[in-house]
């Protein structure tokens, strides 16, 4: 299982939100580059970065920070948030990003998504964020009438190989992942699944590992120290 420490960017700082609410933010580190280096130092093999400002604005607003992170660490970095054109995708790859996560575009701009997948294959990940089972977009501000399962099936048909699934109600809560939704998703598609939202303990990670989930994104639990990064990396290596 792959472990992805999370860095959420807002106004150039590393923050955490509670249930996706932009008004409920906590600054975890004023220096995201330093935070990335800390994660790498403690053994992280890859990083997950979200440009929260970009997710709302529809364009990357923290590109310079992302570039500095990519230059500061030697591990692969995947980035999502506000990526809605091929130019934006190419710009991220040009500054050293390993994989790009498309969210809103997956729902509203299928031609762009199809072209991106055609050009970059497994380098394109789709992020599906759900609220009460329905897909949320534009920085989680809009909730659609499309179920997360239906969108996942569409993505698989297009050729998407990896999906990041987030249950928004769990994000930043340390309440544990939504196992039921993940199980249903697993039964519905054969893509790789990366679970995000609510991961609070080593036990949560073990449970997801037992389900053969490909990867887990861990944010608040690392900052609040309810999960030790070195320990979780060791545990998943032994599983």
Curated annotation (Swiss-Prot):
Chief location: cytoplasm
InterPro entries reported for this sequence: Aldolase_TIM (IPR013785), His_biosynth (IPR006062), HisA_bact_arch (IPR006063), Isoase_HisA-like (IPR044524), Isoase_HisA-like_bact (IPR023016), RibuloseP-bd_barrel (IPR011060)
Keywords in alphabetical order: Amino-acid biosynthesis, Cytoplasm, Histidine biosynthesis, Isomerase
Record Pfam families: His_biosynth
Family: Belongs to the HisA/HisF family.
EC numbers for this chain: 5.3.1.16
Enzymatic class: isomerase
Species of origin: Bacillus cereus (strain ATCC 10987 / NRS 248)
Name the UniProt record assigns to this protein: 1-(5-phosphoribosyl)-5-[(5-phosphoribosylamino)methylideneamino] imidazole-4-carboxamide isomerase
SUPFAM superfamilies registered for this protein in UniProt: Ribulose-phoshate binding barrel
Subcellular location: Cytoplasm
GO process annotations (BP): L-histidine biosynthetic process; L-tryptophan biosynthetic process
GO molecular function: 1-(5-phosphoribosyl)-5-[(5-phosphoribosylamino)methylideneamino]imidazole-4-carboxamide isomerase activity
The reaction(s) this protein catalyses: 1-(5-phospho-beta-D-ribosyl)-5-[(5-phospho-beta-D-ribosylamino)methylideneamino]imidazole-4-carboxamide = 5-[(5-phospho-1-deoxy-D-ribulos-1-ylimino)methylamino]-1-(5-phospho-beta-D-ribosyl)imidazole-4-carboxamide
Pathway where this protein functions: Amino-acid biosynthesis; L-histidine biosynthesis; L-histidine from 5-phospho-alpha-D-ribose 1-diphosphate: step 4/9
């Amino acid at each position: 299982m792959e472990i992805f420490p999370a860095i959420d960017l807002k106004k150039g700082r590393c923050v955490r939100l509670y249930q996706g609410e932009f008004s409920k933010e906590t600054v975890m580190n004023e220096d995201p580059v330093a935070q990335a280096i800390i994660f790498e130092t403690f053994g992280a093999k890859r990083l997950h970065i979200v440009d929260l400002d970009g997710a709302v604005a529809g364009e990357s607003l923290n590109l310079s920070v992302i570039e500095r992170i990519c230059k500061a660490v030697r591990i692969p970095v995947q980035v999502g948030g506000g990526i809605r054109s091929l130019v934006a995708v190419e710009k991220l790859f040009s500054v050293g990003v390993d994989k790009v996560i498309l969210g809103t575009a997956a729902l509203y701009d299928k031609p762009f998504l199809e072209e991106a997948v055609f050009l970059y294959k497994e380098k394109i990940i789709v992020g599906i964020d759900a609220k009460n089972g329905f897909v949320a977009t534009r920085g989680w501000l809009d909730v659609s009438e499309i179920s997360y399962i239906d969108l996942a099936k569409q993505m698989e048909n297009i050729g998407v190989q990896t999906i990041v699934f987030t249950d928004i109600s769990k994000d930043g809560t340390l309440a544990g992942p939504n196992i039921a939704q993940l199980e249903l998703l697993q039964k519905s598609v054969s893509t790789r699944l990366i679970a995000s939202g609510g991961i609070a303990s080593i036990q949560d990670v073990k449970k997801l590992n037992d389900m053969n989930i490909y990867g887990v994104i861990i944010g608040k639990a690392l900052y609040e120290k309810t999960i030790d990064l070195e320990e979780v990396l060791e545990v998943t290596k032994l599983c």
